[in-house]
Every structure is written in structure tokens, then in C-alpha cells.
Swiss-Prot record:
This is Myoglobin. Transmembrane segments: none annotated. The modification Phosphothreonine is found at residue 68. The gene is MB. PANTHER family: MYOGLOBIN. It comes from Tupaia glis. The modification Phosphoserine is found at residue 4. Residues 2-148 form the Globin domain. Nitrite binds at residue 65.
Length: 154
């Protein structure tokens, strides 16, 4: 299920575009997540009160959290699958503290793909989309395996 060197290069090339504005990309990813899957908003006490897209866009906390999420993901992607050290604490907190189901990680993966498609169409063609989907699936599978070790049925 691993990615080839060429696939990782496609992933990291488009991720370079994300790094020009991590917070902006992260905010847009979270807005898409919450709009597409409103049930996910219930996991975020800090954002539950945000009902409209305008409220979400105006929230500095949402932007800050988007930055946190995509910064962590960027660090994981740069490990090209050798991300055990990064995955372990993330799985621990998301299983025991936040109780985030793997399904929600699928939802945010979809949102990431959609944001990259809309913001970087020239750098995110079919090959790059397939590579990113594969990288995000690898991440989710590894998180799910850690969840299982922790006894979390997410």
C-alpha cells in the first residue's frame, strides 16, 4: 500500500503550495469538513457555536486550529510513510481525549482533496490527486491500527 518515490514527489510538490498559507488552507479544509459533515462539528467544543460559513471564516480560533491540523499532517507527509513517531501521539490524543472516529478522518481527507483541487488545479491533476488520496489512506490506516492497539473502536 506504500507510495512510490514518484507518488511521494507529487504529494510533496502540491504540499509545497499548501505551505505558502497553511492557516488559510487549514481554515478552508475545516469549513468544508463542517459544511459537508455537520456532525463533525460536535467534536469541537470551541467551534460548536459557529453556524454559518461567514462565522467560520471570521473565527481566528478556527484558522489557528486549521494551521495546527495541516502543520501536523505536513510533518507526517514529509516522512513518506515512515511516520510512526508522529502517528503515535496523534492517535493517542484523537482516540482517548478527542474520541475522533476514523470515519471523520476520511471526511477530512475528502475535504483536503477538495481544497487542493479548488486552490491548485494546475498542480493537482489526476496523478497528484491519486497520490494524495493514497498518502491520506496510508495515514488513516496507520491511525486506525493505533486506535485498535489503544482499544478505541473509532
Amino acid at each position: 500500500m506504500g507510495l512510490s518515490d514518484g507518488e511521494w514527489q507529487l504529494v510533496l510538490n502540491v504540499w509545497g503550495k499548501v505551505e505558502a498559507d497553511v492557516a488559510g488552507h487549514g481554515q478552508e479544509v475545516l469549513i468544508r469538513l463542517f459544511k459537508g459533515h455537520p456532525e463533525t462539528l460536535e467534536k469541537f467544543d470551541k467551534f460548536k457555536h459557529l453556524k454559518t460559513e461567514d462565522e467560520m471564516k471570521a473565527s481566528e480560533d478556527l484558522k489557528k486550529h486549521g494551521n495546527t491540523v495541516l502543520s501536523a499532517l505536513g510533518g507526517i507527509l514529509k516522512k513518506k510513510g515512515q511516520h510512526e513517531a508522529e502517528i503515535k501521539p496523534l492517535a493517542q490524543s484523537h482516540a482517548t481525549k478527542h474520541k475522533i472516529p476514523v470515519k471523520y478522518l476520511e471526511f477530512i481527507s475528502e475535504a483536503i482533496i477538495q481544497v487542493l483541487q479548488s486552490k491548485h488545479p494546475g498542480d493537482f491533476g489526476a496523478d497528484a490527486q491519486a497520490a494524495m488520496s493514497k498518502a491520506l489512506e496510508l495515514f488513516r490506516n496507520d491511525i486506525a491500527a493505533k486506535y485498535k492497539e489503544l482499544g478505541f473502536q473509532g
